């Protein structure tokens, strides 16, 4: 895929910095009110690898504040919806989807599962 969609980022940061972003690997845990917006902006910045984690499903009460919450998405898994959205923004993104809640005692294992920037 062409990187034309990143031309404004390249103008702002330069080619070398864009390549750093494209090699970066980011972890986003929780895709609710803040996490989904963060994940989307990270993807739009050109980050090349991302792990997203959430086990929740969209409920009607999420619609007023969550990016992926729509009447048409009620009952669907937030992690899968976000994955679809991120791949639509950047088809080249390497995405790992963790469809479970991350408990305190699992944090270290998740952080050790990959090299995150």
Residue ranges, per PLM feature:
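Solvent-exposed alpha-helices and their adjacent loops that cap or buttress functional pockets
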Residues: 19-20, 43, 110-113
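Glycine-rich adenosine-cofactor-binding loop
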Residues: 22-43, 49-54
């Amino acid at each position: 895929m062409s990187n034309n969609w990143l031309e404004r980022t390249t103008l702002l940061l330069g080619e070398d910095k864009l390549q750093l972003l494209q090699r970066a690997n980011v972890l986003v845990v929780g895709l609710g009110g803040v996490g989904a917006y963060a994940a989307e902006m990270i993807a739009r910045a050109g980050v090349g690898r991302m792990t997203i984690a959430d086990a929740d499903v969209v409920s009607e009460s999420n619609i007023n504040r969550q990016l992926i919450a729509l009447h048409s998405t009620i009952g669907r898994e937030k992690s899968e919806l976000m994955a679809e959205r991120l791949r639509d923004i950047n088809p080249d993104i390497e995405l790992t989807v963790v469809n479970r809640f991350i408990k305190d005692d699992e944090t270290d294992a998740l952080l050790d599962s990959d090299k995150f920037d």
